[in-house]
């Protein structure tokens, strides 16, 4: 499953919580239910657009989510491995960004967003990068365009490959490729058998 995770959007006034934090929390719960249904019921789908992903995660009866329900019969309702890939707009742990102390109210690092990531992982997903590199510091996948952040490696790790636990024995490696330019993000890589 790949999709764009909504950002909770930083506030206009410094020191306040992100503007869309409540929406982000609802979305996270719906997305967790959705990807667990993909795994548990063997539902086959790919979220091909932001709108389709939002509809699917929010439980919308039209569009992708409805198609997914129909596909469950074709898939036989058996368990299916799931990999979530992309920009999840959250740095899960303090180790996942350069300046955690000054960012606890920043979109992508609020306690609420980090807790939702913990809930997703505890529902049966593995953070593949941390599986192989539990203590590696200064490993980031996103840098602001401001203040020469990339050159100084003042970044956040917000791009992930999350895999269901049944894939863990097949994981070979997971990497971040910071030397590949092209945007404010760099590629992340997962090798699986």
Model-based region annotation:
Residues 1-193:
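Active-site regions of metal-assisted phosphoester/phosphodiester hydrolases
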């Amino acid at each position: 499953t790949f999709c764009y995770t909504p950002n909770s959007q930083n506030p206009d006034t410094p020191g306040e919580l992100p503007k869309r934090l409540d929406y982000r929390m609802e979305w996270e719960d719906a997305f967790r239910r959705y990807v667990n249904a993909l795994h548990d019921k063997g539902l086959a789908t790919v979220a091909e657009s932001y709108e389709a992903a939002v509809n699917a995660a929010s439980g919308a009866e039209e569009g992708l989510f409805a198609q997914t329900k129909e596909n469950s019969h074709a898939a036989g309702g058996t368990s299916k491995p799931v990999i979530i890939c992309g920009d999840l707009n959250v740095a899960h742990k303090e180790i996942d960004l350069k300046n955690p102390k000054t960012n606890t109210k920043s979109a992508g690092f609020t306690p609420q967003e980090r807790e939702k990531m913990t809930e997703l992982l505890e529902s049966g997903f593995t953070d593949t990068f941390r599986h192989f590199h539990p203590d590696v510091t200064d490993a980031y996948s996103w840098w602001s365009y401001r203040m020469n952040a990339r050159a100084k490696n003042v970044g956040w790790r917000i791009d992930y490959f999350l895999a269901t636990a049944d894939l863990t024995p097949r994981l070979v490696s997971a990497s971040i490729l910071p030397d590949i330019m092209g945007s404010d993000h760099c590629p992340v890589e997962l090798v699986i058998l």
